[in-house]
From Swiss-Prot:
Pfam families: Ribosomal_S11. It comes from Pseudoalteromonas atlantica (strain T6c / ATCC BAA-1087). Belongs to the universal ribosomal protein uS11 family. GO terms for cellular component: ribonucleoprotein complex; ribosome. One of its GO terms (molecular function) is rRNA binding. InterPro entries: Ribosomal_uS11 (IPR001971), Ribosomal_uS11_bac-type (IPR019981), Ribosomal_uS11_CS (IPR018102), Ribosomal_uS11_sf (IPR036967). One of its GO terms (biological process) is translation. Located on the platform of the 30S subunit, it bridges several disparate RNA helices of the 16S rRNA. Forms part of the Shine-Dalgarno cleft in the 70S ribosome. Keywords: Ribonucleoprotein, Ribosomal protein, RNA-binding, rRNA-binding. This is Small ribosomal subunit protein uS11.
Amino acid sequence: MAKAPTKSTRKRAKRQVADGMAHIHASFNNTIVTITDRQGNALSWATSGGSGFRGSRKSTPFAAQVAAERAGTAAQDYGLKNLEVFVKGPGPGRESAIRALNAAGYKITNITDVTPIPHNGCRPPKKRRV
């Protein structure tokens, strides 16, 4: 039986983006780093859990640093130079993720804290008794 002719397609070139935004969601259990363009379309993302850390090691500053490095290197294919950073959450990976993006060669133009603060909304969880 003859093989069907395969259609040759060229790989589409990645679009070039000069300025972007980095969204860092630092919870107590994990850190999610998403790098987007100016319109908010995701270019790359990485998490502490997806970077090989499991359990309580996900919530360490080093895990957040590794996640930010992975997201930063994946976004370099788009030609990003400048980043505006938005940090959300009280987690331990806030500062180290920003430092890792800076060390990856990005010029950080602005850092904004967008942590949602309730105006006396839902009742918070009870305090832990260890």
